[in-house]
Amino acid sequence: MALAVGWSVCVMASAHDALGISDWIGNGTYMSTTSANLACCGRNECAIIEDGAARYMKDGIEVHGDATYFIQRAPWLHQRIDEVVPYTEIQPSEDKYFWRCQWPSPTQRSEARPHRTCFFAPPPGS
């Protein structure tokens, strides 16, 4: 059921954010590493992590800083992130930036507690 809902949202969206820069996430076949059968859709669900906010550490990538959602038009939506993402949950970033996806997105109304569904990172040192 969740897979069908996730895929239908992806199919209906022509751009995954106002600028189209996260389209590679939704256009790919990326699936959540934390939620069964949930696509990393991208439509207002994925935010770019600000430069310098993510660091490779022993147990995962430590994030302390803002994530920016490119929703509709400026001013963009900023969300403070303070977490450690285990290496087992990290997927390769196609554009060399750190990206964090969550469901429900900041613009969705839901009883569900927002949680990280996908995290994309460039290779260390790139």
Region spans (language model):
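N-terminal secretory signal peptides
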Residues: 14-71
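Secreted/extracellular small peptides and ectodomain modules produced from precursors
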Residues: 8, 38-39, 44, 99, ...
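Bacterial N-terminal signal peptides
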Residues: 1-10
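Processing junctions and N-termini across compartments
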Residues: 9, 34-35, 95, 112
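C-terminal partner/receptor-binding element of secreted or periplasmic proteins
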Residues: 93-126
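Short Fe-S-cluster ligation motifs
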Residues: 63-99
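Residues embedded in well-ordered secondary-structure elements
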Residues: 4, 28-29, 90
